């Protein structure tokens, strides 16, 4: 059986806080009773049977394990409220106690709530490809690992034979080709899989243009693997690292995610690195093209992308740049004497890779970047220490559930914990659930980043992070404005509670450090970006090289980052009015102006990191309310309430499709189904805006949906994905289905029933 390990290290691993927050899965062939194994097989079979109706796992393996380790007291039966019934406090508090008992039972011993953070169908396959190249596939992925990877890929194959960009999406060349290749590497034959799954996949790929039609990121990976030629890729010259910092296209001005993808890519491109051409690679060259490999027009293939993958078509000016670099710059840079510059550029690029590796304890900013850095380190030195350290941190990236083994972005431990704490505190049941809160408080304190990046971090295009909270855990090291703000909020809230209940409060100097990080990130327009100060011009987005993302090249401001920053600073000002008071007042004022400025004409806010208008609106409304705005004195809040009420479904809930993010137009979930997480976001917005003082009926109707949806064990059902990034890719947060219904019910009890 698979076992989730919490806060445990491993050979050669380094941690700044004794691995608090670390979560990784190990396979133990002797673990589990026959009954437990049968239970696991049952939920696997049920997922596979229903995989086309419900594409997200319910994260049941983790829940089953932790509930056995942390048994809770018997809970009362679930409450059901009829349409004609008035919602009573007893109904709400019973539902809350059932929810909190369940959610406390799946808290890890280090204080965080483990949970899946996955969904994209391009995180996993590069790990399989990279380890195949390096020869360590069977060392890192045992037969049990490989079995679960194969299970996952087949479970998320679409009915037409292809795979999507993410698990809810239509089939794309990117997802299909990478998945087919990964399955072949893992030993699947040409006709293997249920109902000829491999043959169907191959047919889909060939019918849609073959491997030449894979997008640019895919072209890179299949080239490194040996299935494609570097002459069919747009250039990634490492010499860009030598441009003067003032140049608008310098990599240091890129969004950190884009920059950290470019670093190892430019190194591998500059070396023209290609893995071993094995018999399998030779076979795949025949399987995945509609013409003989040696007859392919690679220059034409550079700009060939399947229409199913094309979300962001390249503007003409970008294609002209690629053409110049390909036909003019590269032939010059690869010949003497300019080849000496290439060698220096390669050293600079790999130097940046090593800096990122060392400062993130070989986790890297995300799994996409990690596997690129891993293969770059191996290309530099197959026997080097850096590559070995990368291997040791691979388990931090994968997650096992009833649908199989998948790769996560990097984990959302701190992000989920910050929300979970606020949700529990909203219930006013602290004395009943103080052990849960105390453990969570210790996790928050242990997760704050204690020091800035090493050395001359500004020369490495890094920003201060001392005092920040990351999205995942301290070892990750990457500051995020909203995570820092949520961490600041819960640290302050805990500091106002009795220490004998929740433990010793955090030192005020550490709160000051967090404030320093937040204030340092604000842009001139008042908004807050996510990771680093905005450094580049907006027109640079014209050179976004990906075909499937939008807003990926430069850092920009987001309402979901601005709102927590404003909210956190407002709470800090309440208790520490003398610390940087003038600057904080100015920052809050400018942040509020930004939030009001980016409101949509219909009263909503577009959410970049969650789906979509319900998500953005919840953040914006919360910040405005925290600064004294309400329905009566703020036109923006009145418009937001009108917007949300216009989207309420006949059953009282809200349900918004991921297509809202992609198409930038509100789209209901298919069948006009309600989603409990989005229903909770809408309710929190209406409660914050004080809609209840005008007409509480819509709030009562939404709360009824939450109460009636609770399951027998106190959990809430898994529904559609509610996370998203870069407009076009979904991300499942399995803890959201617990956190936000609890939070909405807690606020409802406290601010509507008791009002």
UniProtKB/Swiss-Prot annotation:
One of its GO terms (molecular function) is lupeol synthase activity. The gene is OSCBPW. GO terms for cellular component: lipid droplet. Keywords: Isomerase, Repeat. This is Lupeol synthase. CDD domains: SQCY_1. Belongs to the terpene cyclase/mutase family. Oxidosqualene cyclase involved in the biosynthesis of lupeol. Pfam families: SQHop_cyclase_C, SQHop_cyclase_N. SUPFAM superfamilies: Terpenoid cyclases/Protein prenyltransferases. It comes from the Eukaryota. Its EC number is 5.4.99.41. It catalyses: (S)-2,3-epoxysqualene = lupeol. The active site is at residue 482. The keyword Cell inner membrane does not apply. PFTB repeats lie at residues 146-187, 511-552, 588-628, 637-678.
């Amino acid at each position: 059986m698979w076992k989730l390990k919490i806060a445990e290290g491993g050979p050669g691993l380094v941690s700044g806080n004794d691995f608090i927050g670390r979560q990784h899965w190990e396979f133990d062939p002797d673990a589990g009773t026959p009954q437990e194994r049968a239970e696991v097989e049952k939920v696997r079979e049920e997922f596979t049977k229903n995989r086309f109706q419900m594409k997200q796992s319910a994260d049941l393996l983790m829940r089953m394990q932790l509930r056995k380790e942390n048994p809770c007291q018997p809970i009362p039966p679930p409450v059901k409220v009829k349409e004609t019934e008035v919602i009573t406090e007893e109904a709400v508090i019973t539902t809350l106690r059932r929810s909190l008992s369940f959610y406390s039972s799946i808290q890890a011993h280090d204080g965080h709530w483990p949970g899946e953070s996955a969904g994209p169908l391009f995180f996993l396959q590069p790990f399989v490809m990279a380890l195949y190249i390096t020869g360590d596939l069977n060392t890192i992925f045992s037969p049990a690992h490989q079995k679960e990877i194969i299970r996952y890929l087949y479970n998320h194959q679409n009915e037409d034979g292809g795979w999507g960009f993410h698990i809810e999406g239509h089939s794309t060349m990117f997802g299909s080709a990478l998945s087919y290749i990964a399955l072949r590497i893992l030993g699947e034959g040409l006709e293997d899989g249920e109902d000829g799954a491999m043959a169907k996949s191959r047919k889909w790929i060939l019918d849609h243009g073959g491997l030449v039609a894979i997008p640019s990121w895919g072209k890179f990976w299949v080239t490194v693997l040996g299935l494609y030629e570097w002459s069919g890729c747009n250039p990634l010259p490492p010499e860009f690292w030598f441009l003067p910092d003032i140049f608008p296209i310098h990599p240091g001005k890129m969004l950190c995610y884009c920059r950290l993808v470019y670093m190892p890519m430019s190194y591998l491109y500059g070396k023209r690195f290609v893995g071993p051409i094995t018999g399998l690679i030779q076979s795949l060259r025949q399987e995945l093209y509609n013409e003989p490999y040696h007859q392919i027009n690679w220059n034409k293939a550079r700009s060939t992308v399947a229409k199913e993958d094309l979300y962001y078509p390249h503007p003409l000016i970008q294609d002209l740049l690629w053409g110049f670099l390909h036909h003019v710059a590269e032939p010059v840079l690869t010949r003497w004497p300019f080849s000496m510059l290439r060698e220096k550029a390669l050293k600079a690029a790999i130097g940046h890779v090593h800096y990122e590796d060392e400062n993130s304890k070989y986790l890297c900013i995300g799994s996409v970047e990690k596997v690129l850095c891993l293969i770059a380190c191996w290309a530099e030195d197959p026997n080097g220490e850096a590559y070995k350290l990368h291997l040791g941190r691979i388990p931090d990236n994968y997650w096992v559930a009833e649908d199989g083994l998948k790769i996560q972005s990097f984990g959302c431990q701190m992000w989920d914990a910050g929300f979970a704490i606020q949700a529990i505190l909203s219930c006013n049941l602290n004395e009943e659930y103080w052990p849960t809160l105390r453990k969570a408080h210790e996790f928050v304190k242990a997760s704050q980043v204690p020091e800035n990046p090493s050395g001359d971090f500004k020369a490495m295009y890094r920003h201060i992070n001392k005092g920040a909270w990351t999205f995942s855990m301290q070892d990750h090291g990457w500051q995020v404005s909203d995570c820092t703000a949520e961490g600041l909020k819960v640290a302050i809230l805990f500091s106002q509670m009795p220490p004998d209940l929740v433990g010793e409060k955090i030192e005020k100097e550490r709160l000051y450090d967090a404030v320093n990080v937040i204030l340092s990130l604000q842009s001139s327009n008042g908004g807050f970006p996510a990771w680093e100060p905005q450094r580049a011009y907006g027109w640079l987005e014209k050179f976004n090289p990906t075909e499937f993302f939008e807003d990926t090249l430069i850092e920009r401001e987001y309402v979901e980052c601005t709102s927590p920053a404003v909210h956190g600073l407002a709470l800090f000002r309440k208790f520490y009015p003398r610390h940087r008071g003038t600057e904080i007042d100015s920052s809050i004022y400018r942040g509020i102006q930004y939030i009001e400025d980016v409101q949509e004409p219909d009263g909503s806010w577009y959410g970049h990191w969650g789906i979509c208008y319900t998500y953005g609106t919840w953040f914006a409304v919360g910040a405005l309310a925290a600064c004294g705005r309400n329905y009566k004195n703020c036109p923006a809040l009145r418009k937001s309430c009108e917007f949300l009420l216009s989207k309420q479904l006949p059953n009282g809930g809200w349900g918004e499709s991921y297509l809202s993010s992609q198409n930038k137009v509100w789209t209901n979930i298919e069948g006009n189904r309600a989603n409990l997480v989005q229903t909770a976001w809408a309710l929190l917005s209406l409660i914050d805006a004080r809609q209840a003082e005008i007409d509480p009926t819509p709030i009562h109707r939404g709360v009824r949906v939450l109460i009636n949806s609770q399951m027998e064990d106190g959990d809430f059902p898994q529904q559609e994905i509610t996370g998203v990034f870069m407009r076009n890719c979904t991300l499942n947060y399995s803890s959201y289905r617990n956190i936000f219904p609890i939070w909405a019910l807690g606020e409802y009890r406290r601010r509507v029933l008791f009002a």
